[in-house]
Amino acid sequence: MLLIPAIDLKDGQCVRLKQGDMDQATIFSEDPAAMARKWVDLGARRLHLVDLNGAFAGKPKNLEAIEAILDEVGDEIPVQLGGGIRSLETIEKYLDAGLSYVIIGTAAVKNPGFLQDACTAFSGSIIVGLDAKDGKVATDGWSKLTGHEVIDLAKKFEDYGVESIVYTDIGRDGMLQGINIDATVKLAQAVGIPVIASGGLSNLTDIESLCEVEEHGVEGVICGRAIYSGDLDFAAAQKRADELNGELDNA
């Protein structure tokens, strides 16, 4: 089970939003590269970056901070990034800079042809971010709810060749209410590619619950507010996940 610390970037700083609201941002660090180093030193095996300004602007807006993070830890672990990725040129720029994966969200839903082209051009590097509320997909920084069912879109995108899916339950994100395990497992069982859970992770119990369903295709979980607020000790959580995985592997 991959525990993936999130570094959300707004105006070059590391912040956390409450339910995607740019006006409800808490600044946790003015040095995102140092934050990345901290998580890697604590045992992170992948990092999840979000260009929040980019998500709303539709183009890269935190390039300097992203490059600083990649310079700091990019040679050590894979780094993935979402937010504002709307063109093949942007993807190419990011992958050339050292990102391992880019996450396409809104653009995948609104312009499936773009996603298809991206999967063809950058095979193995494209992750789809599906944000949903009550099983329906949301777009545009969660501000618009579509009529699309998550599972239907996930199956379609799997056919295009996406590497994995980051699934966010937006009713729970930043609220420390616990991961929506049932919805995550349902999605993972419906597709043959890995699913990464996101939104609502609050404590060690969530990690233990996710480890129990890893065999269904839940590859990891994005750790956001809980590791910044102190509700979850990241190093202890990764250690516990590794212990559980060892127990499950030996069972």
Swiss-Prot record:
Its main location: cytoplasm. One of its GO terms (biological process) is L-tryptophan biosynthetic process. It is an enzyme of class 5 (isomerase). One of its GO terms (cellular component) is cytoplasm. The keyword Hydrolase does not apply. InterPro entries: Aldolase_TIM, His_biosynth, HisA_bact_arch, Isoase_HisA-like, Isoase_HisA-like_bact, RibuloseP-bd_barrel. One of its GO terms (molecular function) is 1-(5-phosphoribosyl)-5-[(5-phosphoribosylamino)methylideneamino]imidazole-4-carboxamide isomerase activity. It is found in: Cytoplasm. SUPFAM superfamilies: Ribulose-phoshate binding barrel. Its EC number is 5.3.1.16. Pfam families: His_biosynth. Pathway: Amino-acid biosynthesis; L-histidine biosynthesis; L-histidine from 5-phospho-alpha-D-ribose 1-diphosphate: step 4/9. Keywords: Amino-acid biosynthesis, Cytoplasm, Histidine biosynthesis, Isomerase. The keyword Amino-acid biosynthesis applies. The active site is at residues 8, 131. It catalyses: 1-(5-phospho-beta-D-ribosyl)-5-[(5-phospho-beta-D-ribosylamino)methylideneamino]imidazole-4-carboxamide = 5-[(5-phospho-1-deoxy-D-ribulos-1-ylimino)methylamino]-1-(5-phospho-beta-D-ribosyl)imidazole-4-carboxamide. Belongs to the HisA/HisF family. HAMAP family: HisA (MF_01014). This is 1-(5-phosphoribosyl)-5-[(5-phosphoribosylamino)methylideneamino] imidazole-4-carboxamide isomerase. The lineage of its organism: Bacteria, Pseudomonadati, Pseudomonadota, Betaproteobacteria, Burkholderiales.
